[in-house]
UniProtKB/Swiss-Prot annotation:
GO molecular function, one term: DNA binding
Gene name linked to the record: dscc1
Upper taxonomic lineage: Eukaryota, Metazoa, Chordata, Craniata, Vertebrata
One Pfam family in the UniProt entry: Dcc1
Major subcellular location class: nucleus
Cellular compartment(s): Nucleus
Protein name: Sister chromatid cohesion protein DCC1
């Protein structure tokens, strides 16, 4: 190990004035069997640092064919290796001048060992959770109601929350939120997505009961629904349907009530009508759609944002099913898919199909500026692809 005199001699050779430096000098040496593969360094922001210091975990998720992501309890981060021009040394106990409480007046030499080294580190960048795979897994075995009589439930894969966390690249909070978005429910410890026809059957039971009892859509009593419909379907499924299409609240007698969401009911009804047709005459569709929803509810085309695409250039005007969840998750692939469907888009038409691609503090306008080219057509701004569209 070096002595203080040797360090001072080195400074003289280098023509560095000792008074220009801090009085404490660290003399570094490599420990036994130190390897660059012993440690991985990761750059974290203040929030993640507090997360780790509080004793919480960070989890790396991804199958063998996927790019790894890092997840906290509520956020997902992209993991990338960043190279550095200088070698990074891992030196526990090495203090910066502001961390030294008592700075000695005379020069002092401190010996410490290097525990590891690396010329790269993991760089984290906040990203959207990759949730498209979730619906794909759940649709392997959709739930279409309890077995009838001696009939057994059709065999198929089932996934618990732990199973899904192993397969889906998302934090637990993001995963739980998306399970609610796709109307999944937990049955016997496994998360299941309802077959859409079965889901609409449940909704039909509820809306027919509301009509027969002349209830207000904003005051649907849970207890009566369960009592009246419990002989037709499992009570848990009736309550799940109310949770999907209504808002839970209590009346003045503290009775649990639901306020049915007009937009959600009308949107689901539209999907039922559109799913078996390639294209629908728009005016005819609007008429059938209004006739199909519960009396007292009003249909509007803005209820179909991200669900259906209207072609106003055709004669007559048409409407077809185009669900945002069926489009690619990757931004470039999403734009390529959209521009292969339609060469030019107005901002109002394309916005529902790219809104979910926006990162933190990013707008759809910024996305369009980056991935599309604008022009005027008949006085209306339209967007077309900046790149050749792959077919």
């Amino acid at each position: 190990m070096r002595t203080l005199e040797e360090v001072q001699g080195t400074l003289q050779i280098a023509k560095v004035k000792e008074e220009d430096l801090q009085p404490v000098t660290y003399c570094l040496s490599f420990g036994d069997n130190v390897s660059s593969g012993d440690y991985c360094l990761m750059e974290v922001d203040e929030n993640l640092c507090k997360h780790i210091e509080s004793g919480k975990s960070l989890i790396i998720r991804g199958d063998k064919d996927e790019h790894a992501v890092l997840c906290s309890e509520d956020k997902t981060y992209d993991l990338k290796i960043a190279d550095t021009s200088n070698l990074l040394l891992f030196v526990p106990g090495c203090k910066t001048p502001d961390q030294l409480s008592d700075i000695p007046a005379s020069p002092q030499l401190m010996h410490t060992q290097i525990w590891g080294f690396s010329n790269c580190y993991w760089e984290l960048r906040r990203q959207r959770p990759r949730l498209k795979k979730l619906k794909k897994l759940l649709m392997e075995n959709p739930y279409d109601g309890p077995p009838v009589g001696m009939q057994e439930e059709a065999p198929g894969l089932k996934y618990s929350m732990e199973d899904l966390l192993e397969r889906i690249q998302a934090s637990k909070e993001e995963l739980e939120a998306h399970l609610g978005n796709v109307h999944a429910c937990e049955i016997d410890g496994f998360w299941r997505i309802l077959d859409f026809d079965y889901e609409m059957k449940l909704l039909g039971h509820v809306t027919q009961l509301v009509d027969s009892e002349s209830w207000s859509f904003s005051k649907v009593p849970l207890s009566v629904c369960l009592e009246e419909l419990g002989s037709l379907e499992p009570k848990a499924m009736i309550e799940h349907c109310l949770n999907c299409y209504g808002r839970r609240h209590s009346d003045e007698d503290n009775q649990v009530m639901y306020a049915l969401d007009e937009d959600k009911v009308c949107r689901a009804t539209a999907q039922l009508l559109l799913q078996n047709a390639v294209k629908f005459n728009l005016s005819e569709f609007q008429e059938v759609w209004q006739q199909s929803v519960p009396e007292g509810m009003g249909t509007r085309l803005d209820q179909l944002r991200g669900l259906a695409l209207i072609d106003r250039s055709s004669k007559p005007e048409t409407i077809s099913l185009l669900r945002v969840e069926d489009l690619p998750e990757d931004t470039l692939e999403r734009f390529n898919s959209l521009f292969s469907l339609r060469e030019k888009w107005t901002q109002d038409d394309i916005e529902p199909y790219i809104q979910d691609l926006c990162g933190e503090k990013q707008t759809t306008g910024a996305l369009l500026t980056k991935h599309a080219r604008s022009s005027m057509q008949n006085g209306i701004k339209v967007y077309n692809s900046r790149r050749p569209v792959a077919t």
